[in-house]
Amino acid sequence: MPMTLGYWNIRGLAHSIRLLLEYTGSSYEEKKYTMGDAPDYDRSQWLNEKFKLGLDFPNLPYLIDGTHKITQSNAILRYIARKHNLCGETEKEKIREDILENQLMDNRMQLARLCYDPDFEKLKPEYLEGLPEMLKLYSQFLGKQPWFLGDKITFVDFIAYDVLERNQVFEPSCLDAFPNLKDFISRFEGLEKISAYMKSSRFLPRPVFTKMAVWGNK
């Protein structure tokens, strides 16, 4: 029986999950919820089901796999990754994995807060000013390795791809000074199952955010 991934009909927090499901060849179907237009942004499609799915902490995204019902995007990623041996193995790898996972979420939220802020245009220059320093740290952390934990791809690479690539969408030249990050993006997109998914009708790179966002809402 296929797993069910529930989320808004956007890229958002589900992008890395969808990529990981595709990479692992997992059998899944999507339940995509649509948000209404301004000014009400009607969310009844989701709210009507929210407390009827048996989720401990009802939220989007969610993954239902038989009796396992999971919310929180990173918990979902870790669940899929454990099934397919796509987690760090040594203590050093696990430490890098934990640091990177949380750092990426901080930076993901930083961009999201900006893009939902009514003062977006006023705040954007400050974000762009700090972007090179942020990316420099990721570049140093990756170093000359193909993947962030070393020679083996793990679930944090899927989060890293999402965060780095959405910053590239936001500011197309932002990775130009970091060849290893650009190579990482190309390497990831060149993976056979990822490449096939990106060419399919299932692929959903846009909109990045919901209709309530100032940037990335289309």
From Swiss-Prot:
Compartment(s): Cytoplasm
Subunit structure: Homodimer.
Phosphoserine, modified sites: 27, 44
PROSITE patterns recorded: GST_CTER, GST_NTER
Biological classification of the source: Eukaryota, Metazoa, Chordata, Craniata, Vertebrata
Assigned keywords, A-Z: Cytoplasm, Lipid metabolism, Phosphoprotein, Transferase
EC top class named in words: transferase
Function: Conjugation of reduced glutathione to a wide number of exogenous and endogenous hydrophobic electrophiles. Participates in the formation of novel hepoxilin regioisomers. Has activity toward aflatoxin B(1)-8,9-epoxide (AFBO).
Domain GST N-terminal: start-end pairs: 2-88
GO terms for MF: glutathione transferase activity
Residues the UniProt record annotates as site (Important for substrate specificity): 210
Any GO BP annotation: glutathione metabolic process
UniProt: glutathione binding residues: 7-8, 43-46, 50, 59-60, 72-73
Disulfide bonds listed in the record: none
Superkingdom of the source species: Eukaryota
Record's catalysed reaction(s): RX + glutathione = an S-substituted glutathione + a halide anion + H(+); 11(S)-hydroxy-14(S),15(S)-epoxy-(5Z,8Z,12E)-eicosatrienoate + glutathione = (11S,15S)-dihydroxy-14(R)-S-glutathionyl-(5Z,8Z,12E)-eicosatrienoate
Species of the source: Macaca fascicularis (Crab-eating macaque)
Domain GST C-terminal: 90-208
Name of the protein in its database record: Glutathione S-transferase Mu 2
One GO cellular component term noted in the UniProt record for this chain: intercellular bridge
